[in-house]
């Protein structure tokens, strides 16, 4: 398929999850409706991951596409119908007998994802070493956490040009080259094993607790029991604490088998969140999630959340923007050359600010223009003018004067305050 056809097929999937309730805003949101290019709900401004959208198939397609043309093809299966690679997520079901007064019932726990290891006891240990609120038990807080991290750490628009907004043929080609490069140089999946199992797989090395580098264990005919003991001492590459004997560890092949992590320490070095499904990107001796690895390589548009492959873009408020996406967060009008106000780190045009966000003057009860000086005390504001900032009793101008605030009113003296009591 040529580039022109790829561009024509692009779409953001606006029908996906349409009308789903927002788990954050509750009834304040009318239901999920994807913004044309912002990757957020048009109604409540929250992301799709904050809504009760069933995305398991979509997420499996996304991760499947990520692993396509890599050494991790064993983790995917192609559908016979359309040839789309699907992520073969390992689901683990554990049955635990629960003793009651008379009978013994069976308690079944389903994990929406588990490390793909043959030893189920090892997988169970791995899960138990994660914080309870992050264990992906079906229907739990941990499952919701995993869903959010899949969306946050591995955005589909970081790997698939068809999920991006109006890329040019040149940008499509550059993005495809970028994705191919990170698949071959950085992408990896963690491997859960017992540290002692790695002796035959990697060099006989150890991590010294408190140190950053691993040191070869002493070998030779004169090896004593002390050296033998040292060789079995392993420490976590992240927290530097020792690994307990018999506890599972995570290895990252791109990092080398002399490094290992506690399950709860296998996190992105930027956002410090658990690397979802142990999918990592390795760069400069650090682990990254997909999002923050890409951020370290390319600028990201603060408007559409996509990586910028264009040679021309703008910078404002310490953020990067596609030229066409430096827009008002409320009405989408272009802000280049216009007055705007930052509201919760989002640019808003002057008319929208006055209409939706401006504070109201306690004196005249009109919105205060962002360019006009004002007086603020606690949650109350006034125009800094002789017409508005006045004594609530005698109307004396209080600019530059001492005043007594009382529930949204201001007084020039105790006498005036008493008269209004």
Curated annotation (Swiss-Prot):
GO terms for cellular component: cytoplasm; focal adhesion. One of its GO terms (molecular function) is zinc ion binding. It holds the Pfam family LIM. Gene3D superfamilies: Cysteine Rich Protein. SUPFAM superfamilies: Glucocorticoid receptor-like (DNA-binding domain). It is found in: Cytoplasm; Cell junction, Focal adhesion. Residues 92-199 form the PET domain. Residues 234-297, 299-359, 362-421 form the LIM zinc-binding domain. Residues 133-164 are annotated as: Disordered. It comes from the Eukaryota. One of its GO terms (biological process) is negative regulation of cell population proliferation. InterPro entries: LIM1_Testin, LIM2_Testin, LIM3_Testin, PET_domain, PET_testin, Pk/Esn/Tes, Znf_LIM. Keywords: Cell junction, Cytoplasm, LIM domain, Metal-binding, Repeat, Zinc. The keyword Zinc applies. Residues 155-164 have a biased composition (Basic and acidic residues). The keyword Magnesium does not apply. Belongs to the prickle / espinas / testin family. Scaffold protein that may play a role in cell adhesion, cell spreading and in the reorganization of the actin cytoskeleton. Plays a role in the regulation of cell proliferation. May act as a tumor suppressor. The N-terminal and the C-terminal halves of the protein can associate with each other, thereby hindering interactions with ZYX. Interacts via LIM domain 1 with ZYX. Interacts (via LIM domain 3) with ENAH and VASP. Interacts with ALKBH4, talin, actin, alpha-actinin, GRIP1 and PXN. Interacts (via LIM domain 2) with ACTL7A (via N-terminus). Heterodimer with ACTL7A; the heterodimer interacts with ENAH to form a heterotrimer. This is Testin. It comes from Colobus guereza (Mantled guereza).
């Amino acid at each position: 398929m040529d580039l022109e056809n790829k561009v024509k097929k692009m779409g953001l999937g606006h029908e996906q999850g349409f009308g789903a309730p927002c788990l954050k805003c509750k009834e304040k949101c009318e239901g999920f409706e994807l913004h044309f290019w912002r990757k957020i709900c048009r109604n409540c401004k929250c992301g799709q991951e904050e809504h009760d959208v069933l995305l398991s198939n979509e997420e499996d397609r996304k991760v499947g596409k990520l692993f396509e043309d890599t050494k991790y093809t064993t983790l995917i299966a192609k559908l016979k119908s359309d040839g789309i690679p699907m992520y073969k997520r390992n689901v683990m079901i554990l049955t635990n007998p629960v003793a009651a007064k008379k009978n013994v019932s069976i308690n079944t726990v389903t994990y929406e994802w588990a490390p793909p290891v043959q030893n189920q006891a090892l997988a169970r240990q791995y899960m138990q070493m994660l914080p309870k609120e992050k264990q992906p038990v079906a229907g739990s807080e941990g499952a919701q956490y995993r869903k959010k991290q899949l969306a946050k750490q591995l955005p589909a628009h970081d790997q698939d040009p068809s999920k991006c907004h109006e890329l040019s043929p040149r940008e499509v080609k550059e993005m495809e080259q970028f994705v191919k490069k990170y698949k071959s140089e950085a992408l990896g999946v963690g491997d859960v094993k017992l540290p002692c199992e790695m002796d035959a797989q990697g060099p006989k090395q150890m991590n010294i607790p408190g140190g950053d580098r691993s040191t070869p264990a002493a070998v030779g005919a004169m090896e004593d029991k002390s050296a033998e003991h040292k060789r079995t001492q392993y420490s976590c590459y992240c927290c530097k604490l020792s690994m307990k004997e018999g506890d599972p560890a995570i290895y990252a092949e791109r990092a080398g088998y002399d490094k290992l992590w506690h399950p709860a320490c296998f996190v992105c070095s930027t956002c410090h969140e658990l690397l979802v499904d142990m999918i990592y990107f390795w760069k400069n001796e650090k682990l990254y999630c997909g999002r923050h690895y890409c951020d370290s390589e390319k600028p990201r548009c603060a408007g559409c959340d996509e990586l910028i492959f264009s040679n021309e873009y703008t910078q404002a408020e310490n953020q990067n923007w596609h030229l066409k996406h430096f827009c008002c967060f409320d009405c989408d009008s272009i802000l280049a050359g216009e007055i705007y106000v930052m509201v919760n780190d989002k640019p808003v045009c002057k008319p929208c600010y006055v209409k939706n966000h401006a504070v109201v003057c306690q004196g005249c009860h009109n919105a205060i223009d962002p360019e006009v000086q004002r007086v603020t005390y606690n949650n109350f504001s006034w125009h800094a003018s002789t017409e508005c900032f006045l004594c609530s009793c005698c109307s004396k101008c209080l600019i530059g004067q001492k005043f007594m605030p009382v529930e949204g009113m201001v007084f020039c003296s105790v006498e005036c305050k008493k008269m209004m009591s």
